[in-house]
Amino acid sequence: RRHWTNVLTRYTVGVGGAAVIGAITLIFAYLLWVVAPILLPAEIAAPTEYRVVERPAALVDVSENGEAMVRISETGIVEFFSVADGSGIAAYDLGSTIVKAKRLSPLVDTYALLDNNNNLLFVKTDYIVDFDGGQRRLSPKLSFPFSNRSIPLGPLDNFDVQLADDDLVIATVRGSQVSLTRFKNVEIGYRLSGSAQVTLASTVQAQEVFLGPRNQWIYLLSKSGEIDVLGIKSLQRVSRLYQGSLAPKGSTITAVTPVLGRYSLLTANDQGDIVQWGALVNANETRFVALRSFDVEQSVAQLITEPRRKGFLSVANDGELSLLYPTSGRLLDQRPSNLPASAPMAISPRSNLLIAAPNDGLITAHSLDNKHPEISWSALWTEVWYEGYEEPIFSWQSSSADNDFEPKFSLTPLAFGTMKAAFYALLFAVPIALMGAIYTAYFMAPAMRALVKPGIEIMAALPTVILGFLGGLWLAPIIEANLSSVLSIFVFLPLLLFAFALAWSLLPEKIVHSTSGWYGLIVTPLILGSVYLAFQFGPFFENTFFGGNSRAWFLEVLGLSYDQRNALVVGIIMGLAVIPTIFSIAEDAVYAVPTHLVRGSLALGATPWQTLVKVVLLTASPGIFSAVMIGMGRAVGETMIVLMATGNTPLMDFNIFEGMRTFAANIAVELPESEVDSSHYRILFLAALVLFLFTFVLNTVAEVVRQRLRRRYGSL
């Protein structure tokens, strides 16, 4: 019977251990499986060609769902084709000759068409899905969003048009003359009315004109790279914001286009350089700085931007296609092609298809596999120069209310916040837990130990959400209102304890020995008294040393700003959560030191303190080290306390009076709201993988060190 019991126990333990290892392996495999797609390279696929009716194209585009293509020809014919086989679906005749066509930014289904009489007409495409005999059918429709009346513009060299909220602006340029027409309270389906017009003189002979963000700026550029930026928030008070050059001396601008949101411009020159220029606006001036550059090694003839992301595609003079993304600074893929450099092209709204009309009777489609262009090693871990910022920064900001928002996916602030929270928690917890464990196991009276040890261990059962709640809503306001008093505790407590210890040593030997092991209970009133004195004298210290306002003093003298929910609160509250773990393991390690070692040391003449330092702590060092490492793992992975007791702001500042955002808290907050399989979703899983690997490596190193300590001191 004993044999079968041993066999059953052995296999049960073995299966349990294998299950734990298997679970850890599965967790790692699943995290890696979710993260893996962001490591795959982007690709421009080989083209698919469609033979269609020969007509010169002014514009080509793709429907939202990628099932239909539209070609607006110079003869005024609007045709729809199937992406699957290139077959014609529908056609409409506008009855006019089109010389130039553009998307009505930021819409992806509305276009501004300029005819040969310089009249501007807006058209809108709709795709209706119905079922005929059980078969799905796509029916394209062409409509006029602002009525079928065209808008006369007069002589012009180029134009741009943009709809921002309910504000429609049309800008035309002819030489150095700029004309602006603004329509207010614009709604799709209603006729345009109530226009305001103004004509301005520019300082450059502009060949390109682009409206800026929210129709508040206008960019005017010449072929030589000269730029004139005007503020047009009010047509009655137009101001010049910037005047300068966006091209190296001796070079010529060959292509220019705004990036989504229009806070920056992309320029390509005849030397093969593509530069992203960002506008920096402050109260005193507006500047344009080169945020980043790309070298495609040959002259670029055309730049095609993505409708809903910051990415773009360049077309070289020999037809080579280059797929790039500014934020990550990556040249994603290149592919040679036979496309004419000036052929009308467009990237689909979902950025998965490139459509081109290389000649009158042909349409080509390149499939784009480019799901995560914003992710790169540099974008995740190094400083990135984002639009509108004075310099490269570390930043995590995954979402915004604006569709033209530039996501910021730097993991560095989250890693920094994780280490910051763990550091301050351990700074508070480790000394208290270890000293308490050593005293409880070695010096404390057995009767008192029987009460103290279970009492501290039961603290581990407290839900961290309760601790976080208390920290954020109770402790944080108290510390904010009594900062000087809280800091005074760290002065009063050690001074009073030292004075008490000195006085206690002067008492008769009989009293000292009779109370041995009960010192923890004896000094408890002293500890409470020191806290009381600190709060009583806190205002005095604040007036004497901090000029009556400690928070203002820290900011003005030390440059440390103060937030109510900060690392100090996290250190205290998370320390309370970590202390039971460290205390319990360390106390068991110290208490388990064989008594014959202690008695032998004392018998050889060592004092109890010498025995503790030279024998007990060395023998217990593997367990003490394990306690600290397990406590650190608990602090690194803590979620609810950090989430509730800090501002949860991803800062790169070690200031104890400011908060942070950690990996765990960030995952808890953002994962439920992220779109499945999006870049944001996969980066959150990458953060989980980084946290998993960190704790795995930490525990592995801790185990190696523990084993070495055990071999070294186990023979004492």
Feature annotation, model-predicted:
Residues 425-456, 500-507, 702-711:
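Transmembrane-helix boundary motif in ABC transporter permease subunits
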